[in-house]
Regions:
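Conserved alpha/beta-hydrolase catalytic His-Asp/Glu region
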Residues: 144-198
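Conserved serine/cysteine hydrolase catalytic core
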Residues: 177-230, 236
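The conserved beta1-alpha1 loop
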Residues: 29-31, 95, 215
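Active-site loop/oxyanion-hole signature of alpha/beta-hydrolase fold enzymes
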Residues: 50-93, 254
Length: 256
């Protein structure tokens, strides 16, 4: 696997690639607060399950990617698309916010063959949106120790209780603050919390390829009725929560 950086309007998208150099390219898009490292368990299964290649980005303002001037789904989709080869058909897999980015990409790129989105929160009343916007205006908290910053990253990415705090891949989710009064903070740009008003029906209207939506039966953020009436295939994983790709990567691979 190699690291590839691509510049687009002064924004750098970090990616990791694997698999074959031809055939459909699987694009794995993490959720809010995460990094591409959340796909490690699923990637380990791909050599035996996916004949093409795959690419794992850190979304704008997350992990090792640079910040962006806006985190609207369409802007994120354009930035990620610029980091991908333009001669490959694409299959997009997105978790939570990454699922919205995947749908926005599919609405703009004719070469997207399929979208699999899971754990996508579709119910966004105005107070929720305003709460997220308010969060985006707060400075990132600086912690005196690296271990405390890792704990904050695990909370922000939904990994607390699911991942070993000592695992080396969490380094992608934090960064050291320079200076005499420095410390450690999460790498996520707080501006990423302001991504606008999610509109699943509008995103789906622009997509012409097949779409599968999935959720864990124990996911309190995404209920079965939230996916009702959207006119796409819906899969429910029994016993899984909001992070099925971490809890049971094989269940997600099975959808491919």
């Amino acid at each position: 696997m190699v690291r590839v950086t691509v510049r687009y309007r002064a924004t750098v998208i970090w990616t990791r690639t694997g698999g074959a150099d031809d055939g459909p390219l699987l694009v794995l898009l993490h959720g809010l607060g995460g990094t591409g490292e959340l796909w490690r368990g699923l990637e380990a299964l791909l050599p035996d399950a996916w004949a093409g290649g795959w690419v794992v980005p850190d979304l704008p303002g997350h992990g090792r990617s640079a910040t962006a001037s806006s985190y609207d789904f369409g802007v994120q989709a354009a930035l990620v698309a610029e980091a991908l080869p333009d001669d490959r058909d694409l299959v997009l897999v997105g978790h939570s916010m990454g699922g919205m980015v995947a749908l926005a990409m599919a609405g703009r790129l004719d070469r997207v063959q399929r979208v699999v989105g899971f754990s996508i929160k579709t119910y966004w009343p105005a107070p929720h949106v305003e709460g997220m916007r308010g969060q985006s205006l707060k400075p990132a908290r600086v912690f005196p120790t690296r271990e405390e910053a890792v704990e904050r990253y695990l909370l922000a990415s939904g990994l607390r209780g699911l991942a070993d705090p000592g695992a080396p891949e969490h380094a992608a989710g934090i960064r050291e603050v320079p200076g005499a009064d420095g410390g450690w903070r999460i790498a996520q740009d707080m501006g990423t919390f302001d991504f606008g008003v999610p509109d699943m029906p509008a995103l789906l209207d622009d997509v012409s390829c097949p779409v599968t939506l999935a959720r864990g039966s124990e996911d309190v953020m995404v209920r079965e009725e939230n996916y009702a009436g959207l006119g796409v295939e819906v899969v429910t994983w029994d016993g899984l929560g909001h992070n099925p790709h971490v809890e049971d990567p094989a269940a997600v691979v099975a959808l491919l």
